[in-house]
From Swiss-Prot:
GO terms under cellular component: extracellular space
Residues reported in the UniProt entry to bind substrate: 58-62, 219, 265, 307
PROSITE patterns xrefs: PHOSPHAGEN_KINASE, PHOSPHAGEN_KINASE_C, PHOSPHAGEN_KINASE_N
Enzymatic class: transferase
Domain of life: Eukaryota
One BP annotation, GO: phosphocreatine biosynthetic process
Organism: Liolophura japonica (Chiton)
Molecular functions (GO terms): arginine kinase activity; ATP binding; creatine kinase activity
Catalyses which reaction(s): L-arginine + ATP = N(omega)-phospho-L-arginine + ADP + H(+)
UniProt xrefs under CDD domains: arginine_kinase_like
Name of the protein: Arginine kinase
InterPro entries, per the entry: ATP-guanido_PTrfase, ATP-guanido_PTrfase_AS, ATP-guanido_PTrfase_cat, ATP-guanido_PTrfase_N, ATP-guanido_PTrfase_N_sf, Gln_synth/guanido_kin_cat_dom
UniProt similarity note: Belongs to the ATP:guanido phosphotransferase family.
Length: 349
């Protein structure tokens, strides 16, 4: 309790924090939740630790485990509504659309604008906690279960699993050059126990073509990524959905009817789907109203090296903004229409 009282003191006494934690963890909510515990052993302290230690956080709240979304709903509910800009905690059933009739293919057959296309989702095991409530043995066990499912993949998805622990320098160098490797450098995740027991239990799986990639125990239990050079969104999306469906046969993923798929950070909930292109748009990006254009199309633009980075040579990472309150196929269609509009504007500029 001393730990929690200290964290609460940090958050409540800070006048400058703009985080959603600061905004929604009122004295009343704190008093109501401070003694509660999830079946995974998760506490309010686990949920707010990162935001209290990093008062410049945007969100500042992580879920201690899948059950935290129910037990600590008085804090997490308002944070979710606020972050996702929705009016009620409601999410449709999972719907990937009719894969044989998507109505779209390659955005950019000429190859003039789109450098690469990528779609990812996050998934959590229903029976394991999130980083704050896991111990070393559980991390190892979760990796074992996930690795078993991944190594059973066949056809185009067939590949190899590389644990981070004991990885040779050669493999490490190759994966870093491929931009496949994740590291332990995010201070927000670190404060949220995201890197406890690092690198135990973490690893990377990818297929022979390096177009299907799975991160194990990075931020989320599982991040499934499909990607390739060029603009063939349909091929990338179908591969991703195929991979998800195969893994679902062997693993049970955490989901709530009103929130969709559960993730460690409430910002990824819902479809958890982020569809993005690296796209050359030097002219549109120079327009003073560029951000406004993206907002109107429900797109997010950032530099190609991830969040908070600048563009290199007019190449931007453009992705769908909305994760909650719409289905997977709706999220993909929204991104497709938005990117088509951006290409049209670039051509006309």
């Amino acid at each position: 309790m001393a730990d929690l009282a200290e964290l609460w003191e940090k958050v409540s006494s800070n006048k400058d924090s703009k985080s959603l934690l600061k905004k929604h963890l009122t004295k009343e909510v704190y008093e109501k939740l401070k003694d509660k515990k999830t079946k995974f052993g998760g506490t309010l302290a686990d949920c707010i630790r990162s935001g209290a230690k990093n008062l410049d956080s945007g969100v500042g709240v992580y879920a201690s485990d899948p059950e935290a979304y129910t037990v600590f709903q008085d804090l997490l509910g308002p944070v979710i509504l606020d972050y996702h800009k929705i009016t009620e905690l409601k999410h449709p059933a999972c719907d990937f659309g009719d894969l044989s009739n998507l109505g779209f293919g390659d955005f950019d057959p000429s190859g003039d604008w789109i450098v690469s296309t990528r779609v990812r989702v996050g998934r959590s095991h229903a029976s394991f906690g999130f980083p704050p409530t896991l111990n070393k043995e559980q991390r190892v066990e979760m990796q074992r279960v996930t690795q078993g499912a991944l190594e059973g993949l066949t056809g185009e998805l067939k590949g190899k699993y590389y644990p981070l622990e004991g990885m040779t320098p050669d493999v490490q160098k190759q994966l870093t050059e491929d931009h496949f490797l994740f590291n332990d450098s995010d201070r927000f995740l670190k404060a949220a126990s995201g890197y406890d027991d690092w690198p135990t239990g973490r690893g990377i799986f990818f297929n022979d073509n390096k177009t299907f990639l799975v991160w194990v125990n990075e931020e989320d239990h599982i991040r499934i990524i499909s990607m390739q050079k060029g603009g063939d969104l349909a091929a990338v999306y179908k591969r991703l959905v195929g991979g998800i469906k195969e893994l679902e046969k062997k693993l049970e993923f955490a989901r709530l009817p009103n929130l969709g798929y559960l993730t460690f950070c409430p910002s990824n909930l819902g479809t958890t789907l982020r569809a993005s292109v690296h796209i050359k748009i030097p002219k549109v990006a120079k327009k003073p109203e560029f951000k406004e254009i993206c907002d109107k199309l429900n797109l997010q633009a950032r530099g190609i090296h991830g969040e908070h980075t600048e563009s290199v040579g007019g190449v931007y990472d453009i992705s769908n903004k909305r994760r909650m309150g719409l289905s997977e196929i709706e999220a993909i269609q929204e991104m497709r229409k938005g990117v088509e509009e951006i290409i049209k504007l670039e051509k006309a500029a």
